[in-house]
Amino acid sequence: MTSRVLKGLLGLGVLGMVLVGTVSTATGQVLRSSPRFPTDTSLVTIVYDASQGNGALAGVAPPIYAHTGVITNLSTSPTDWKYVRGSWGTTNAPLMTSLGNNLYSISYVPRTFYNATANPPGVPAAETIRSLAFVFRNTAGTIVGRAADGSDLYLPLYAAGQLHTAILNPSGNNSIVQPGSNLTFVGAASQVCSLSLRVNGAVVATTVGDSLGYVLQFPQAGNYDLILEANPGGVGGVVVRDTTRLVALGNQAAQPLPPGTVEGVNYINDSTVVLALYAPLKQHAFVLGPFNDWSPDGTYRMNRTADSAWYWLRMEGLTPGQEIPYQYLVNGSQRVADPFAIKILDPSNDRFIPATTYPNLLPYPTGTSGIVSVMQPGAPAYAWQNTGFQRPDPRKLVTYELHVRDFVGSRRYKHVMDSLGYLQSLGVNCLSLMPVNEFEGNDSWGYNPSFHLAADKAYGTENDLKALIDSCHGRGIAVVLDVVMNHAFGQSPLAQLWWDAANNRPAANSPYFNPVPKHDFNVGNDFNHESPATQRLLHRVVRHWLMEYRVDGYRFDLSKGFTQTNTLGNTGAWGNYDAARVALWRRVADSMWAMSPNSYVILEHLANNDEEKVLGDYGMLLWGNLNYAFNEGTMGFPTNSSFSWASHKARGWNKAGVMAYAESHDEERLMYKNLQFGAQNSLVNVRNLNTALKRQELVPVFLMSIPGPKMLWQFGELGYDFSINRCPNGTVNANCRTDAKPVRWDYFTTPERKYLYRVWSAMNQLHKNEPAFATDSFFLAVAGGIKQIRLVHPDMHVVAAGNWDVAVRQGILLFPDNGWYYDYFTGDSVQVTNFTINVILDPGVHKLYTSRRLSPPNLALGHNEADDWWETPRYGDLEVYPNPAIEGFTVRWPSNNPEPQSLQLTDVQGRVLDRMETQHDGQYQWVHCSSWPAGVSPGVYIIRGPQGRSARLIRP
């Protein structure tokens, strides 16, 4: 066999390099280097071709910056960059030199270029640099050059003085060829040696030198496995190799989609699946995974339907119960996870998820890049315990909006479950979870979705989420998921598969997204909800969580955005009545109710009232934002505090469909503004903590006296007073809006805050249990300082009254009839004549009168049966939470002593089961136990500390 050396191709010019040892997929001609085999201590010139890869920076005028770091032996994954240079979105980053024609270069010595500000400068000598990692950007960071599959770009470094080899052409993004075609193979070695090329095991070319070229021919369809071998010769010489695979595509007869097949994984039995991908306008697709070394293989080429829109593959003989990672390779260059995956592996973010949060997480596989989907035929089914749950009447919903990250310090579903007793005692009968499907990163509100059917692993396992829902149902609490179907972010394969890199937006031919959003409030990529593909996606999402996780409904984020009516530049017009949007939501609601009767359709709509009336009267529940009105009132400015819009009757609706709230995740916390901006005079100072907390009692008394579904935001019942815009460093800035906020379970030990909790609890119980609070006959007079609500019902009449002013107010309260009425909170009675009574109310005082005597709630600051969920500590005793504790728990007590203290965990007979040592944080002695000691069975235990401190702890 004759070989020839392509000196012209392998001269002194910079060449593309294949990434070896970190990620087997090559970055191809996106990056080239001189020398061809760079080392960490020698000068290397790197050339970036902006027209290659994702091509996002092609034609973008300079300056172009490198965002770069290194992958070392200490990196935990291919995306674990070390010693990153520069700050994103600034000019404090390495500037590339323009060479023209979309080419940019930079030169440096890697060992000293990174970590340059250290003393001594450079990457520590003990740390091995395996590769250089890059993405490239414009100044603002709004346009980013990456690999074709959206992953980072890598350039390997090599050990000096050793033999290395690399296949330079074909590159990793050039793995598909046509039968009968030719391709010029180019390989190189770091020193003169014996080079040989094998194709499917047979040697087809040899040479002695540092490069080898050969014209490959592909006479027929099939796999062509290429191996480049470099043999230094001599005794003890080690042969080194580089490999790649090409697939010659033959003609493919159209195959109909198997009946009943939907996008994603279709489980046929415990060992057989059908994978289906909807990918119109694509030419071919392969399934990749460990079963084919993440390389295209003719055996795993997907069938295509006659309309060239669907690709599918049946896989048999799989191991039941085994998790199998997989991806799709589309058009030979787009490597994506299954957009309909129910579980993914993320090389950038999974490494930050503690094993206690997600035990036994499947490791990210070697041999590929980007997000990977996971299937599991024959997966064990979750054993549901509470199968007879009856959903509460929507008119009586007391919904608690909760963000897992900011509700429990562990950020885990399991510890939310530990706290359900707290919510049950509060009177909650519906838990609304902020988005729990996969979103970008691990630390987020969740409104940046990437995979709509996969549960985000940052909060726990899929079964942890199911157990939380199951436990809620066991306590009479419905569960609603916040789902984000207005948009998806860039990690979504639905966006990546049809992407306009030049304009950094969805392509015009995307079957899912609008290239340009239709309204000004859009974030991410705007779904086209009139597209059949998007409608199928929405249907799948709705069905998946209702059926697989048994949720009770959805809060649809930004539901007003489900429209193709273009209102860009005219936000006011966006809220106008939109008949197409109404029809879409009716279709969604009908579909949900057909799948799961009486499931909740909750819309964050905030459109004009005429449209909301139609949707509400159809049976949907619509968010009613009364934050401004209630906060004006609690701050002591009653003139601007009419909250009549919390009433469906005030809106002219026929059904009680307004889910009114004073606080939500998206609004400023009432107590923060009370303390910062509350009214002050000689009588009242709302900026005083106890005064502000006392005024907060007005909120549940009035909000929960209005018939219809209601919502409160987490810890509002305790007077949470950190701003929505609080930053981790304690400052307040709008850029920190979605950052993590302090988790303040210690509020429950403050008597004034616990009193507020009990007022909320009492009103919540009335709202969900007393028929009068769901009456259709009620009246609001809430415009002035003294506000009133009247409920008329055959079972009982109710009058709520309160002084929202900061001055003493005299007023006349109107009653539905004459006779004796009873103050619910005090037990006092009043006799009503002429349907009125005269009152003089101090600032912030509230009254709730009922025509039937009810047992007054126990609001005393001593023990209350509603507190049994937690072992309430006496002064100086230990605080233990959560309690009961399924798994981990935290113990603490106030202390000025900075020295570590010893604690013991004992059983009720006094036998010591474990010993712990505390830390001091400047205010408290504390210790966190991530798990119970081995062998500890469910029961009651005692935590014993110094100076006789103790607390009871329950393991359920």
Predicted regions: what is each one?
Residues 867-881, 885-956:
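C-terminal outer-membrane/trafficking sorting elements
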Residues 28, 341, 345-352, 379-580, ...:
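Substrate-binding/active-site clefts of carbohydrate-active enzymes
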Residues 246-285, 337-396:
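Basic K/R-rich, polyanion-interacting modules in nucleoproteins and related proteins
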Residues 61-125, 141-149, 266-269, 274-323, ...:
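Aromatic-rich carbohydrate-binding modules that target alpha-glucans
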Residues 285, 833-862:
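C-terminal beta-strand-rich structural cap/linker in extracellular carbohydrate-active enzymes
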Residues 26-38, 156-177, 870-882:
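Short, compositionally biased P/S/T/A/G/V-rich stretches that sit at domain boundaries
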Residues 210-223, 838:
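Solvent-exposed segments in extracellular or luminal domains encompassing
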Residues 253-254, 437, 445-448, 473-475, ...:
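Active-site-proximal helices and loops of the catalytic beta/alpha 8
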